[in-house]
C-alpha cells in the first residue's frame, strides 16, 4: 500500500471529560499519518444517546485542538466522507444490518432486558462468563415476521461460528488467536434503530476508507466480531494495531480513581500542550537518554510504529513535570513565556471562576495567591498540622472522610448544588451537623482552614481531583489516629 493511501482516525465518544488516554491514542494516529503522508480523521462516536452530549463533544474538540492535533476531516470542518458524527449517520447503517440478516449471518432477538439479566445471573452463578445463549436463533421465519409486523421490540444480533477460532495479525501483538466460543453474539442494531459501537465502527471505517485502526488494547478481544462483520459484508478489514494501555506507576490501569486523567486538569494547572504531547510521544519512539525534549515535528520524524512495546506505558507525573519544566526553561523565549502565561490566564475557566469567588474575600490583590493557590496545585503537601483547628478527633475525621468518598461518587451532575445536596444527606445519615462534616473536607480540598467556599471549590476542581485529595487526606488523618495525635 502506498503511503499516500494511509487514512487513520480518532473516534472518541462525547460521554465525559476528554481523557489523556484519548490524547495518547489520537497522537499515535496523528504521528502515523504524518509518518506515511496520510490523512488523520476525527469522527464522533455518539451511539450512546443517553450519555453523549454536545457539551462533551465541544470539550473533546477543544481538548484535541489544545493538544496541537489537526485533522483533515471531521464534524467541525466536514469532508468527502461525512457526516462525521454517528448520530447524523443513523440511516446509513440499517441497510448493512439488513444485508447481514438477509445473507443468514444475523438474526432478530426479542429477548427482554429482564430475561437477559436472568440469563446472565444464572451463567454467573454457574461460573460461566455471561453471553447470549442463542434462544432466538431457533425462531422460525414465520414467527419472526409475525412478531416484527406486530411491532414487538427487538434487536439484531450477529451469528458466531460454533467451533474453531479467529486468527488475525495485529500490528503490535503479532499473530493472535481467539476461540469463537469466547465471542458473544453481538447486538448490531438496537431496538431504537441505532447501531451498536461494533456495527457503526465497521461501517464507518469502511465508508471513510480507513486503512489502519489504532486503538487501545481493551478492544483486542472485539477484533473477531469486527472481522466477522467485514466478512459478512464482503469487505476487506483494515490493519489493526492495539496499543498498550497507559498505567500508573504501580502498573495498575490508569484511571480517574487513582490520578487526574482529564485533559482539562492539565490545562488548568498550566501544563504546556507541547510538553504533554512530548511526554506521550516518547512511548512511540526509541531515543537515547538526553534526547527527550522533542517538538511534534521531531516526534513525527522519529516515530517508530514497528517497535511498539506490549508493556503498559507508565504515566509518570514526575517525568511529565520534568519535561514541562524543561519546555518552559529551554524551549520558550522570554516573550513566548509571557505570552503563554497570559494566554493560560485568559483562557482558564478555573482561574476565572476562582477570581470571582476571591473578590469578596480579599482586601489586597497580594492576598490572592494564598487564598486561591490550591486550585492550581497538583499536590497540596497536606500535613497533620493543617487539621489542628478542626473540632473533631482524628477518628471522627477519618469516619467522615471515609463515609463521604463513596457518597460523592453517586453524584451524576458534578456541580456545587448536587455536591451540597449529597453532603447534607450524608451529614443527616451520620447524625451530624453539616458544619461538622465539611470542616475536615475543607482542609482536605484546600489544604487550609481559610479558603474559598467549599462546594464551589469542589465543583471547580472537578471530581477526579477532589477524589484524590480526599484519599490523601484520609491517609494523613489515619496516621494521626494511629499515632494518637
From Swiss-Prot:
Motif window: 'KMSKS' region: 253-257
Catalytic activity: tRNA(Glu) + L-glutamate + ATP = L-glutamyl-tRNA(Glu) + AMP + diphosphate
An example Gene Ontology biological process: glutamyl-tRNA aminoacylation
Chief location bin: cytoplasm
Record bears the keyword Cell inner membrane: no
Gene3D superfamilies in UniProt: 1.10.10.350, HUPs
Keyword match Ligase: yes
Binding site for ATP: 256
Similarity field: Belongs to the class-I aminoacyl-tRNA synthetase family. Glutamate--tRNA ligase type 1 subfamily.
Protein name: Glutamate--tRNA ligase
The species this protein was found in: Sinorhizobium medicae (strain WSM419) (Ensifer medicae)
